[in-house]
């Protein structure tokens, strides 16, 4: 849930309470003409939200505004990512954070310095790890599956990161072996959460969620599910085209959301594909097994091709909107199986 309000004269900041509980200050964002608060981790239901102005001395002022009976709905969890699986990433299926989940706030100024304790060895050996990519890499050791939510605030560029473990794509989320449980959520806060100048490589990972942010000018693919991934949920993203590549068909970068290497149980939903060259490749030539993928409620907006291009995978596509797509819609090729319904 989120709410917006006009600034009150004399207020330097605001506190926001949901059913009497104060939300994290990082969830309150100031824009040119308004403020916005994101209230994350609520289950479906009715809530009372109170916005209290705060003066320059940190004291709460008069003029609080209360909204009663704010109705919160759960995310649509249709699709193969949730098939026989509960709680992708850091959240339960009811929308609440898992009981032991960590929350880390990622901004341009904290991506290098954010830190947390990670189990990195036998007998519960722990160490404090600093930097976004370093924290993700520490999970690759396979000892720690503590759910973790990375909350992206504002614009985070390639130069802001502590490093990238994939020179081709950008941030790498990699499990120790195929289909390793990671329990990670990457989620945007506010109206302007943006990943700029890089994308994501996901490999050997299970239980990863991406939601509510934009990816712009990625290195190669915006989102590459490369090898042996499962239960991956990609939703409510704005996906712009990437940097120009060396090949003739890479004027707008390479792929946008590519799914291959025996990745399975993936849902791509409620995303806006903006003018992409190649929107989504699904499968290569050797996938076998339950490579079941769902695309639903996506908006392919002036994108050129691969909506999706499917090889050797089984895909369900429904309620997608194709607007002025230049080359072709869905491409069914080698060994593919596609069920399409209610697309426009």
Descriptions of predicted regions:
Residues 1-11:
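Conserved aromatic anchor
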Residues 13-16:
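Short beta-strand elements bearing conserved aromatic residues within extracellular beta-rich modules
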Residues 37-63:
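Beta-strand-rich modules
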Residues 54-82:
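Extracellular fibronectin type III
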Residues 81-102, 106-149:
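Acidic Gly/Asp/Thr-rich repetitive segments characteristic of extracellular carbohydrate-active
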Residues 124-145, 161-185, 194-211, 216-229:
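Extracellular beta-strand-rich solenoid/capping regions of secreted or surface-exposed proteins
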Residues 155-177, 183, 239-252, 276-282:
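Acidic/polar low-complexity surface segments
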Residues 182-192, 206-217, 229-245, 255-256, ...:
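Right-handed parallel beta-helix
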């Amino acid at each position: 849930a989120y709410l917006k309000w006009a600034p009150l004269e004399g207020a330097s900041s605001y506190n926001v309470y949901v059913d009497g509980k104060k939300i994290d200050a990082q969830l309150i964002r100031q824009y040119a003409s308004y403020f916005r608060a994101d209230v994350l981790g609520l289950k479906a239901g009715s809530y009372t939200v109170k916005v209290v102005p705060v003066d320059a001395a940190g004291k709460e002022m008069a003029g609080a505004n209360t909204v009663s009976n704010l109705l919160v709905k759960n995310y649509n969890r249709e699709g193969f990512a949730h098939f026989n699986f509960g709680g992708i990433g850091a959240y339960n299926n009811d929308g609440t954070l898992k009981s032991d989940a960590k929350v880390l706030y990622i901004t341009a100024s904290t991506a290098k310095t954010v830190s947390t304790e990670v189990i990195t060895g036998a007998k519960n050996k722990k160490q404090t790890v600093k930097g976004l990519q370093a924290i993700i890499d520490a999970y690759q050791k396979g000892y720690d599956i503590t759910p973790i939510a990375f909350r992206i605030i504002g614009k985070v560029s390639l130069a802001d990161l502590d490093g990238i473990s994939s020179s081709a794509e950008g941030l790498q989320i990699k499990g120790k072996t195929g289909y390793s449980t990671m329990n990670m959520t990457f989620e945007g806060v506010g109206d302007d959460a943006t990943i700029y100048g890089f994308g994501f490589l996901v490999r050997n990972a299970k239980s990863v969620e991406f939601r509510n942010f934009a990816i712009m000018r990625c290195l190669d693919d915006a989102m590459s599910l490369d090898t042996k991934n499962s239960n991956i949920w990609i939703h409510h993203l704005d996906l712009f085209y990437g940097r120009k590549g060396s090949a003739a068909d890479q004027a707008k970068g390479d792929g946008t959301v590519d799914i291959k290497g025996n990745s399975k149980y993936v849902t791509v939903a409620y995303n806006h594909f903006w003018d992409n060259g190649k929107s989504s490749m699904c499968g290569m030539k050797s996938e076998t097994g339950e490579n079941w993928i769902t695309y639903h409620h996506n908006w392919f907006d002036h994108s050129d091709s691969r909506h999706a291009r499917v090889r050797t995978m089984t895909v369900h596509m429904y309620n997608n909107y194709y607007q002025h797509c230049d080359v072709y819609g869905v491409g069914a090729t080698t060994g593919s199986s596609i069920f399409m319904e209610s697309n426009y």
